[in-house]
Design a protein with these regions (language model features):
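Cofactor-binding active-site loop characterized by glycine-rich and histidine/acidic residues
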Residues: 31-188
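Structured loops at beta-to-helix junctions and adjacent beta-edge loops in soluble globular domains
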Residues: 27, 80-82, 91, 199, ...
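Cofactor-/ligand-binding subdomain signature composed of acidic, glycine-rich
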Residues: 1-51
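Alpha-helix initiation and N-capping motif
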Residues: 9, 21, 58, 85, ...
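Short loop/turn segments at secondary-structure transitions that flank enzyme active sites
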Residues: 22, 30, 94, 260-262
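Glycine-rich ThDP/TPP pyrophosphate-binding loop and its adjacent helix/strand module
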Residues: 132-309
Length: 310
């Protein structure tokens, strides 16, 4: 084991598992939020809205960054793929940030029910990050602006470190790819650091992303051309992620590899939005959803939250 301890790694994994569960629950459930009985058609929301495919990768990035920078008060995380809002919401609930602006978002059964039922719900929470989301400076519904915002935040603030998660589909936008040129503006001691993280999960909404089609060598050379040092990360290996964050290199650019929709019943582009279309009326899909939810061991969630978070 590296300098990162076994207990740290296990806590990272636990957090990812809990947040993945909360994402699925937000997308599908209007009742029985912790699976305290068998799932029924009446537990499923009448209209399913949202995006599952990017959520696991967001949870992986958030948990690992949280562990690495937990004592750094000048660290900021910017989420590019705002359509992965269920993941951001889950993490804000666990960290108590949502509670600061919404007293119903408690870290218990009641709070979990609250965020899940009200996701994509009338007078509830939106399907994408919004100005009402605590700490948000990038909405993320229209992709491409996260990197530019990160560099703007770093300019003139030498104390700041900003990690920005960019989707591989997002990096195809003109604004995002051109924003990599802004790295040169950070030269000198009067500016902060920007840590780009490319979430390479392979697919956008309907096809493989351009960057997923490139070989590792091609992608690395592209990144080097913008003045960065590329660092590959296996998204399913928390120790590897922590080791990558601990590397001392000039202008790191992290490439986080995950499988789109990891953990769900369908992978690749089919999982970009809602991977199960009819669990409210289809018995087989309802069973698939129940098995999917059970894979995260929901019976342990309240105990883990009570022991590790306050």
């Amino acid at each position: 084991m590296s300098a990162v301890g076994i207990a740290e790694i296990e806590k990272i994994k636990q957090r990812i598992r809990i947040c993945d569960y909360l994402c699925v629950a937000q997308l599908f459930l209007q009742d029985n939020f912790l699976l305290e009985r068998s799932l029924e058609f009446s537990d499923i929301k009448p209209r399913l809205l949202g995006h599952w495919g990017t959520c696991h990768g967001i949870n992986v990035a958030y948990a690992n960054l949280k562990n690495h920078f937990q004592k750094n008060q000048n660290f900021t995380f910017i989420l590019g793929p705002g359509h992965g809002f269920p993941a951001l919401q889950a993490n804000l609930l666990i960290d108590g940030e949502l509670l600061k602006v919404d007293k119903k978002a408690t870290l218990d059964k009641s709070g979990i029910e609250y965020i899940c039922k009200r996701f994509s719900w009338p007078d509830g929470f939106p399907s994408h990050a919004s100005p009402l989301t605590p700490g948000i400076i990038t909405e993320g519904g229209e992709l491409g602006y996260a990197l530019a915002n990160a560099y703007g935040l770093a300019l003139g603030h030498p104390e700041k470190t900003i990690a920005v998660l960019i989707g591989d589909g997002e990096l195809e936008t003109a604004t995002a790819i051109d924003s990599l040129n802004l790295q040169g503006l950070l030269a000198g001691s009067n500016n902060g650091k920007v840590l780009p993280i490319l979430h390479l999960n392979g697919y956008k909404i309907s096809a493989p992303s351009i960057y997923a089609r490139k070989s590792e060598r091609e992608l690395n050379e592209l990144i080097r051309g913008f003045g960065f040092t590329p660092i590959m990360i296996n998204g399913e290996d928390a120790e590897n992620f922590q080791e990558a964050l601990n590397k001392k290199v000039e202008a790191p650019f992290y490439i986080l590899k995950t499988e789109k929709g990891s953990g769900g019943p369908n992978s690749h582009h089919e999982s970009h939005q809602i991977p199960l279309k009819n669990p409210k009326t289809d018995e087989e899909e309802l069973k698939q959803l129940e098995e999917w939810l059970k894979s995260y061991q929901p019976e342990e969630i309240l105990t883990i939250l009570g022991e590790n978070y306050d």
